[in-house]
Amino acid sequence: MELWVPQTQGRTTGPSRDANRRLQSGHYRPRPHPQYSGDNYHQWQDTHKNSKPQQDPRDDHQQPHYVPRSGEWSQPVSGADYLKGSYPSHPYSRSGYEDPYQSYHTPTPRDEYAYGNYYYHGHPQLPQGERVARQGSPYIWHEDHRDQRHFSEHHWEKHNSTFEANSDTQFQFTSKNPYNDNPASAFGLEQPGEFFPESGAQKQKPSLTSKSNLLQQHESGLSSSSYELSQYMTEAPEQYEPMVSATWRPIQADDTSATVPKAPMRFYVPHVSVSFGPGGQLICVSPNSPADGQTALVEVHSMEVILNDFEDQEEMRAFPGPLIREDIHKVDIMTFCQKKAAQCLKSETPGSRDSALLWQLLVLLCRQNGSMVGSDIAELLMQDCKKLEKYKRQPPVANLINLTDEDWPVLSSGTRNLLTGEIPLNVDTPAQIVEKFTNLLYYGRKKEALEWAMKNHLWGHALFLASKMDPRTYNWVMSGFTTTLALNDPLQTLFQLMSGRIPQAATCCGDKQWGDWRPHLAVILSNQAGDAELYQRAIVSMGDTLAGKGLVEASHFCYLMAHVPFGHYTVKTDHLALVGSNHSQEFLKFATIEAIQRTEIFEYCQMLGRPKSFIPSFQVYKLLYASRLADYGLASQALHYCEAIGAAVLSEGGSSHPVLLAELIKLAEKLKLSDPLVLESRRGDRVLEPDWLVQLRRKHKELEQTRTGDLRDPDLTPSDIYGARGTTDTPYRDLYGQQNYSEDSEYSSALWPTSEQTSLTNPTPQQPFPLQRDTYSERDGPVHMGTPVPLYSVPATHLTVISGSSSGSGVAVTGAPGGRVGEEMLQKHPALGENTVPQEAVQDPDGLAVISSPQTPLAPRDRSFSEDSAISAKEDEEGTSDGADKPPHPDASQKEKLRDGKNTKSSGFGWFSWFRSKPASSVSTSGDEDSVDSSDSEESPRASPPHHASLGLSPTPPLSSPSLPGASTFPRGTGGNSLQGSSNSSGMAEGVGIGGFSGPQGVSSEFYSQPGALPPPPTLQGAVPLYNPSQVPQLPTASSLNRPNRLAQRRYPSQPC
């Protein structure tokens, strides 16, 4: 048997064929079955040219079906192999994108699938030389995705799959392709473009030695169903057009050069594109193609109409919000609350009775303009408690007098005593009982009289008698009286509360044994007298007990009666965040529409009595409610809510949250066109925003500038600001005190400007200056105390030493621009009893006393340069050497040496060494240092000697002043004025700076006397400031008149007033 041997490469140059496809050499050349057609096709050679059979790699599964000739035998294809060979093995991939040079195998026709003729039967393929490509076919992919091939030879096939011999040299097979059926092929006519030379794409096809389809399919694991699905996920298929194929040429210049990979489309199936508009619209775009002549269809639907039947939308439409005091009448609110209460009573759920009580409370508050009267609330509580059972008294457990187990006699007892056998006497009448009580008192037996009165329930006589005796006896009789009452009796609750104790009902209510909680709360609210805090704690305890047992509405009723403020959802320790909703559950179940509406009505009731009494933490839930209104298509009502929230935020002042402002502005920006007034006020393309939205933008901008520190004007000094205000308070004191951002360190640090944000230049680590108290002369008035730290740096008043002759010298005081500096502010000797600062003065060889600058205290959490740090001492030396380039001052250099000497002598205990060690006396070069060290032996502060210079500096701020977080260094202020002090007998001048800040020593005064001159560079570059306890205020200003502690006075000298 001779087999058809496939040609390894190229196209067989066989004899020419006629139009009826018969071989002129007399041999039949059968055409392969469509099942075995594909990119890896077979070309069969004549047996005369190659007598050696060549094994086809796919002979095991793919054998050609043709009419056998006599003398030839071919093995039939088994059913399993027939089905296995029906699927290609190449996995589906994005054509032209992942591998532009990968050849994609043409899928086998679906007439060979297991489902038979259910699917569309694909194109049978011809040998390589006889195929006509079709452009845009979704079933045939080649190297170039646009170079699609279609076949015109499919028109030979008839309606059965067997071959029909038309003559001795021709045969036909059936085609089931509805796209390519053409009667021209039935008559043997040539198709357009049937014969054409080989293109470059065909020459680059893989040879027969490549991996077969079956093997690739087996390796990829692609099933038949997934492969079928991949055929529909091709890029947009186009209908076959005969006019296009007739004019198409096999080789196109554009197609051969276009090898750039293209990303596949995101959607393979036409779909509808939808979007939600800000005004409650739903925009739908139909999948039409305007390029094909189809008009673009855009549909606009109203969400209010679409969601008309939803329960949430009906609930929000029925609510008359937003509740503004000037727009909504309270009768409408009362009617709404009464309907809600009636619905809760009809539902008969476990918490429906308590929920109805909340709605009835809102009706009462709305009627009384938000005021709560205890008797009215008690009447509301007792409306449903009239049919309750009577409280049963409990019998006494023991005799309170002799503490025995003997029970008190019952008044109606007249039977025989089983223990003694005695028959008791007849029951005494009330008159006889009182007479016996009186007879006992005749003989002075008060204890027996009390026993008799308590046994016979003469509690009035017993309590009055006990009240005139000692307090222990009175408490004993009171306890005996209260124990006769039932534990769940409201009288028991009241008596325990009047006795100064939290009643037992406050911690046990809510159980079935205790019965209803309402009478207990009613008796507490109706009899509030004495300690109001005790009553409030009792009501809050009752609310906590009810909340612990799952009665959320009942607990919130108690919280509202106790005036508990509203909390936040994230803080689980808060008592309530929304009225009637438990904030310990998930947010969607917590922030319900009904809970938000109840809370808004409660806020409205409060505003009836106090117009500006908004609930700050509730504004974010109103914004959430407005967003839900917009989602359900109620855009105009949502815009009104934004306006109401904006009014509440603007009335809060500086305590507004910037995130809430930003989200409110975003929502209002989307909904502003829903206001007809805004549409009418349009001027061309510009839409005028409402005034409240403009104010919100301005307020949000101010908050952002305050956070970044840009609000400060660099041209204004603190003295100018304070002079205009007439006070020494900082303008941002309320902003920092009211905003609850203590936990947000990032925001807190942003409130304070850094050195880069300030306009002043050259910060120095030695000059961290919180705002000091201004020092005024006696003529200007008393000293202003306790000025807090500002949000910006204060230009310092610098003290410089002016070198002069040996007979006289002066100290220059440089003040801030606009500051008041006078000669009367130069204090030579501070008064006794003031917080004076003993200054360290170093005697110059020329007779000039150098005054060291006092270290101004830092606020807590700030770190400065510790005087006992070796790093600080080393860097001070470097700073001194750097300062030598400036105009030299021997006194300043000597002062730095003095500081270095102190630093080298310090111990290794850190800042605690201030308490443990004393500075060495060897480094003291002046008598003033000795006088400071010897202050332990002094009983009171004394004035400095006349030959030493003493400065009246500003005292430290009180401990209650706000701290300065996140700041370690501050810039120095440039001085604008220089003042020469008058010389005294010793040739020294004394001066005080306005701001109470001393400037750097050893620097020429020309840097501070000229406003335009820049101060010298900082002495320390890149140093890490350390914590210095000497710069922390130790004592408040109020204790300045008291004698300070010796150790504190010696180590932490206080500042003078």
From Swiss-Prot:
Organism of provenance: Rattus norvegicus
InterPro entries per UniProt: Sec16_CCD, Sec16_Sec23-bd
Tissue spec: Liver, kidney, heart, spleen and brain.
Record field: compositional bias (Gly residues): 990-999
Function: Plays a role in the organization of the endoplasmic reticulum exit sites (ERES), also known as transitional endoplasmic reticulum (tER). Required for secretory cargo traffic from the endoplasmic reticulum to the Golgi apparatus. Involved in peroxisome biogenesis. Regulates the transport of peroxisomal biogenesis factors PEX3 and PEX16 from the ER to peroxisomes.
Bilayer disposition of the protein: Peripheral membrane protein
Gene name as annotated: Sec16b
Residues with the Phosphothreonine modification: T856
Description of how the protein assembles with itself and partners: SEC16A and SEC16B are each present in multiple copies in a heteromeric complex. Interacts with TFG. Interacts with SEC13.
Main location: endoplasmic reticulum
Gene Ontology cellular-component annotations: endoplasmic reticulum exit site; endoplasmic reticulum membrane; ER to Golgi transport vesicle membrane; Golgi membrane; intracellular membrane-bounded organelle
Protein name: Protein transport protein Sec16B
Renumbered residue ranges of the record's region Disordered: 1-86, 185-220, 704-778, 849-1057
Start and end residues of each stretch annotated as Central conserved domain (CCD): 263-708
Feature: compositional bias, Acidic residues: 927-938
Protein family: Belongs to the SEC16 family.
Induction or repression: Stimulated by intracellular signaling factors.
Biased composition (Basic and acidic residues): 45-63, 704-715, 883-903
